[in-house]
């Protein structure tokens, strides 16, 4: 493969004299390593007149055309070349200029050069501290280890907050001496391969019912239980199945009337697994037949929702991968390995099955794991330092950002292990609370940043360099301030106390409906302190009647609202879930009644949804507003697109048992978006999703062909070894991995 470091030069003619030759004014742009690893020989155009030129470059803020008078793309270089280009008939020169002859108009989109006016799917922010981009074009699901949906839903919301993601990727700043190679793939210390054939054997032993595997890991060839749990529920599965009818029946009826517009998050009667659905199991390439972790909720517990566009978990017409290969988690798509491709957007998306929208969620989850790539983050990537929640979260973000592909599944086993080590409350088989996890995680991240800032400040004092300004971006992004004022009604003395908060609670009272906009448009809380609850006044030196006023003093950049739906019931002697209607808007105006200057407009950026009839059992999913792809539904391993109106349906209205639990609002600093602009934006986001899928399939095709080519010498060596074994009559062991059924427990 050819690697080239590129520097673009924009040509402009400038004549000094009549006989002078034309000189070039060069405008240099800094480039970082590209985001994909593609072999030039494996992606080519059918015609040399129309080369497949897709130069992935970075750090371009505006859309420009880089063509000289001969209609050639001109790229000058003073050092090494490092381009990720699929082209044909190109001339490479270390010292000269790189041309693509007879090329079409080639446009640069903030980090990408592609033919035609296609959307900039591969464009990302790139800097010295983010050499592989900011991860804004990546869409990954998270593997569920039995009851980790509470963790997955929150992590998805945090990743899709661009300001938080970028800060985590850049802090603490890595020294040049500790420069680590790019994480193009993440197999982990104990690689796992998800295959179809091994799952068929497991199905045969379960009388056709989908199994629910017991999470295990492999250590020295012996299966050992991993510190994960079996289920996210605390009761029988028949109790769980009721709450999956939470998605309103109205959604089904409305969408049945319109052909071609299937419902999102809707359910009727739970259906069983389709007979033709390909099963799945996991094999470990290092140890034949050794079981590994894999968790799915029971099929009857999942809603047969019909999404519009599936991004992760797409069911394609595929061939079985090589059983003996341990180099990839990806399937080889039929008809792609030998096909002639131009740019990915030039090829129509004919690989998605027309009936994929009818596939069950369980089938999509399996397809997501089979298709991969599965980023198996089973150990700390932080070197010799002890793993923390911050370093583990950064490992996840880095692996997603630096991965070759645009979509896939993350297996955050190391993060979950660290979480259970740091807080024993999460090291149980009980149903966990997503808000408690979010609050604990933010505090841990904030404390880590404070410790690192102290280390940096101490090193600056010992060195001759100027001390750097320490800041805590968790506090900057999430922390607001409440002011608590108590006025003595006897002497009118006012006592004030400020209270910081990372998330703002929304109380649920009785059977009343709650409108979040009405509460926060002029927020204040008044309470009379009298009777047995009198206030001790320092001025009066005694207990006095007083009035307490709570208001907003400072608003955060990201406002997190906790809808307090879980409450202890004395009558039932347990915690129950409240299904009061809580209405939340897409745009939220928050103002303080104490200080008129404290006012901010927010837009909804993410929701953690709890699906269930009580706090002891249920399932968490999240909906996040992606900056390029609009609203996406993240359900553990799978990701699918949803319409904006769907986001507002989780209010708790009966019989819907899927309710918004945690809301993320981002501050808006620009003018409001007009209705026409919203429609254009929605269309652009739909196009971006289509282009994302095409690009991702294209990248998989290129890399699939490359891996096949790399495996040819290995196969030749194996044939030679076999021939030698026949001559010497010495038996050799087969390299084929054997599968073995492992135990499952029903969720």
UniProtKB/Swiss-Prot annotation:
Transmembrane segments: none annotated. It comes from the Eukaryota. Residues 174-183, 251-260 have a biased composition (Basic and acidic residues). Keywords: Hydrolase, Phosphoprotein, Protease, Thiol protease, Ubl conjugation pathway. PROSITE patterns: USP_1, USP_2, USP_3. Residues 172-305, 318-367 are annotated as: Disordered. Its EC number is 3.4.19.12. The modification Phosphoserine is found at residue 198. InterPro entries: Papain-like_cys_pep_sf, Peptidase_C19, Peptidase_C19_UCH, USP_CS, USP_dom. SUPFAM superfamilies: Cysteine proteinases. GO terms for cellular component: cytosol; nucleus. Residues 140-668 form the USP domain. It catalyses: Thiol-dependent hydrolysis of ester, thioester, amide, peptide and isopeptide bonds formed by the C-terminal Gly of ubiquitin (a 76-residue protein attached to proteins as an intracellular targeting signal). Residues 225-235, 319-343 have a biased composition (Polar residues). GO terms for biological process: free ubiquitin chain depolymerization; protein deubiquitination; proteolysis; regulation of protein stability. GO terms for molecular function: cysteine-type deubiquitinase activity. Pfam families: UCH. The active site is at 149 (nucleophile), 619 (proton acceptor). Present with 125 molecules/cell in log phase SD medium. Belongs to the peptidase C19 family. This is Ubiquitin carboxyl-terminal hydrolase 13. It comes from Saccharomyces cerevisiae (strain ATCC 204508 / S288c) (Baker's yeast). The gene is UBP13.
């Amino acid at each position: 493969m050819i690697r080239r470091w590129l520097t673009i030069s924009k040509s402009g003619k400038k004549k000094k004299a009549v006989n002078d030759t034309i000189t070039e004014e060069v405008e240099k742009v800094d480039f970082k390593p590209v985001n994909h690893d593609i072999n030039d020989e494996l992606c080519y155009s059918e015609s040399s007149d129309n080369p497949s030129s897709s130069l992935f470059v970075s750090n371009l803020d505006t859309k420009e055309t880089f063509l000289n008078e001969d209609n050639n793309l001109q790229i000058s270089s003073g050092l090494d070349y490092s381009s990720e280009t699929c082209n044909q008939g190109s001339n490479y020169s270390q010292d000269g200029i790189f041309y693509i002859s007879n090329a079409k108009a080639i446009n640069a989109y903030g980090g990408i050069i592609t033919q035609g006016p296609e959307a900039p799917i591969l464009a990302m922010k790139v800097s010295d501290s983010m050499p592989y981009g900011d991860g804004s074009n990546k869409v990954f699901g998270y593997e569920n280890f039995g009851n980790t949906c509470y963790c997955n839903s929150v992590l998805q919301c945090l990743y899709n907050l661009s300001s938080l993601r970028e800060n985590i990727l850049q802090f603490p700043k890595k020294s040049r001496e500790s420069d680590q190679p790019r994480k193009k793939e993440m197999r982990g210390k104990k690689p796992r391969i998800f295959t179809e054939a091994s799952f068929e054997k497991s199905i045969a032993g379960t009388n056709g019912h989908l199994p629910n595997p017991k999470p295990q890991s492999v250590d020295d060839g012996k299966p050992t239980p991993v510190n994960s749990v079996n289920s996210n529920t605390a009761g029988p599965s028949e109790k769980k199945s009721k709450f999956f009818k939470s998605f309103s029946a109205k959604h089904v009826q409305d969408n049945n009337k319109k052909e071609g517009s299937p419902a999102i998050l809707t359910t009727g009667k739970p259906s069983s697994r389709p007979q033709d659905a390909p099963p799945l199991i996991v094999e470990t390439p290092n140890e034949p037949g050794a079981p590994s972790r894999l968790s799915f909720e029971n099929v009857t517990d999942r809603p047969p929702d019909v999404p519009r566009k599936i991004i992760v978990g797409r069911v394609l017409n595929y061939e079985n991968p090589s059983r003996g290969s341990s180099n990839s988690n990806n399937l080889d798509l039929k008809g792609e390995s030998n096909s002639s491709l131009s740019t990915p957007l030039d090829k129509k998306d004919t690989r998605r099955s027309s009936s994929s929208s009818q596939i069950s969620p369980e089938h999509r989850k399996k397809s997501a794991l089979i298709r991969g790539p599965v980023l198996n983050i089973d150990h700390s990537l932080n070197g010799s330092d002890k793993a923390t929640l911050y370093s583990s979260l950064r490992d996840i973000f880095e692996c997603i950002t630096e991965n070759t592909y645009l979509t896939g599944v993350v297996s955050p086993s190391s993060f979950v292990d660290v979480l259970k080590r740091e807080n024993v409350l999460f090291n149980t088989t009980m149903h966990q609370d997503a808000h408690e996890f979010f609050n604990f995680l933010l505090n841990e991240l904030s404390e880590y940043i404070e410790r690192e800032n102290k280390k940096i400040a101490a090193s600056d004092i010992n060195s001759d360099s100027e001390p750097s300004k320490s800041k805590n971006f968790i506090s900057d992004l999430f922390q607001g301030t409440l002011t608590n004022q108590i006025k003595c009604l006897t002497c009118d003395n006012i006592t004030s106390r400020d209270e910081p908060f990372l998330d703002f609670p929304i109380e649920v009272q009785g059977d009343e409906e709650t409108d979040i906009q009405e509460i926060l448009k002029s927020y204040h809380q008044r309470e009379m302190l009298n009777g047995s609850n009198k206030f001790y006044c320092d001025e009066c030196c005694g207990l006095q009647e007083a009035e307490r006023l709570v208001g907003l003093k400072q608003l955060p950049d990201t406002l997190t609202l906790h809808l307090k739906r879980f409450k202890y019931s004395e009558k039932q002697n347990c915690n129950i879930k409240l299904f009061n209607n809580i209405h939340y808007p897409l745009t939220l105006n928050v103002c303080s009644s104490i200080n008129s200057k404290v006012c901010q407009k927010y837009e909804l950026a993410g929701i953690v949804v709890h699906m269930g009839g009580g706090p002891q059992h249920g399932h968490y999913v999240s909906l996040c507003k992606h900056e390029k792809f609009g609203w996406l539904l993240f359900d553990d391993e799978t990701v699918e697109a949803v319409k904006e109106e769907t986001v507002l349906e989780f209010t708790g209205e009966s019989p819907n048992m899927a309710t918004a639990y945690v809301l993320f609002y981002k501050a808006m600093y620009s003018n409001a978006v007009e209705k026409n602009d919203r429609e254009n934006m929605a269309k652009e986001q739909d196009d971006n999703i289509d282009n994302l899928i095409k690009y991702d399939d294209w990248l998989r095709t290129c890399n699939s062909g490359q891996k096949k080519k790399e495996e040819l010498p290995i196969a030749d060596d194996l044939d030679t070894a076999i021939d030698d074994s026949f001559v010497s009559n010495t038996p050799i062991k087969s390299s084929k991995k054997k599968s073995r059924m492992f135990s499952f427990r029903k969720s």
